[in-house]
Amino acid sequence: MALGKRKVVQQPLFVTVADLNVRSHPFYDAVNKVLDAHHFDVFVEGLCAGFYDDGTRGGRPGLAPGIYFRCLMVGYFEGIDSERGIDWRCNDGNALKLFLGLPVDKPAPGHSTISRTRRPIDLETHAQVFRFILKVLANHSLVEGKTAGVDSTTLEANAAMRSIVRRDTGEGYQQFLERLAKESGIETPTREDLAKLDRRRKNKASNDDWRSPDGPDAKITKMKDGTTHLAHKAEHAVDLGEGGHGAILAVSVCDAAAGDTATLVDTVVAATENLAALADDERVSDKVSGRWMSEAVLGKGYHSRQTLPDLEEMSVRSYASEPQRGRQRWDGQADARQAAYANRRRVRGERGKRLLRSRGEKLERTSAHCYETGGMRRLYLRGRENVAKRVLVHAAGFNVGLLMRVRYGLRKPRSLPAAAAAARALIFALVEWLRSIVAAARATGPVASPRQLPDRCNPALPAA
């Protein structure tokens, strides 16, 4: 066989679709079957009709809402963080064009088209789409709703720390350090002098003194890895019930500088509203617990004298891990004391311990799928509302993946080759195990059959 060489080939001017050998992806085919069975496109088109022109003025038609929301779901399934990345990925594979409902000879929507479609569609509409996917899960008996776990995580904003400016004077951080150096007697400070001066300062990056002109909603925050960035905070409410499978009941994007106790009530209210919408829908009302959102499982950051009584007023029983605070005084705070002691009794019981273990398992898994493998730990959108729109559809994609895992054993399209590799490894291990058994049998010699045994050792033969 002669050596083949790579040559510069002129592409053909015309090619038929039959020659492209287009193949769909089985995972995305399954997702489309579920969405089509519940009339997803009809729902979102009716929901978004008010944000589009009626067509009387002519012009190019806008991007279909069903395609727009599917593009954002592709961001979750493929682990893509930016709209430019979604644009590139959808145009790279014909299988994704089929998932979006586009002909293979037409380009997928570009990043500017996705951005232009996102801006007029308000946040409440994105929340309605998230609620629709939650109803799909409830229709498949994957939502219980009685017990919810709440946790938060930080998302790095699309703004650099070097761009922050003073709230009072508007000067940048470098200019601020140079002014401090001159006030301390250094006329021409070097970079080493500025770094030394910066290390000696205390409270050098306070949200009360500094802001980002690129992202006013982003706040200076210490991330989980110990670094400091401008960030937003995402808070999840996840189904932890006995019959639940860890579906996201609500998600909100909050001020990163606000403590967990300040944002908990809003997330609980959002989860309650979503579950109330399920209870009001006669198609799924019998598949959701009648005592929806009656228990909240929380971490140590949510335990406070104000939070626990607030939850009791909302008829929500708390299972909050209690931090070590030593001996406490409860002068004039009888309600807070009663709520704290009741929470302590529940946490120390068997059910409380089981729920806290379930919280550590399902909540951590949710954050990992949405923000680590889902590619949303670093944001490329500016403005808290735009971030919340993307996070809501991202969480809806997580719930769709949960349904796929329960029905087909695959949460994401990348799970398909992983499952095939696991099956091949299992078959290989079984073959090796059988080979070892055969080799051991050959080493010990043939096993005597009952006819080959002496008469006295063979009870099956009659005595002589």
Task: For each feature predicted by the language model, list its residue ranges.
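Anion-binding and metal-coordination hotspots
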Residues: 79-91, 102-464
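A short structural micro-motif
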Residues: 50, 92-96, 155
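Hydrophobic alpha-helical membrane-insertion signals
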Residues: 1-32
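Short alpha-helix boundary/capping elements
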Residues: 39, 76-79, 94-98, 400
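Catalytic micro-motifs at enzyme active sites that drive phosphoryl/nucleotidyl and oxygen chemistry
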Residues: 58-60, 99-105
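Short hydrophobic/aromatic segments of transmembrane alpha-helices and their interfaces
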Residues: 11-13, 97, 138, 350-351
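Basic, short loop/linker segments at the boundary and entry of helix-turn-helix/winged-helix-like folds
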Residues: 24-73, 78
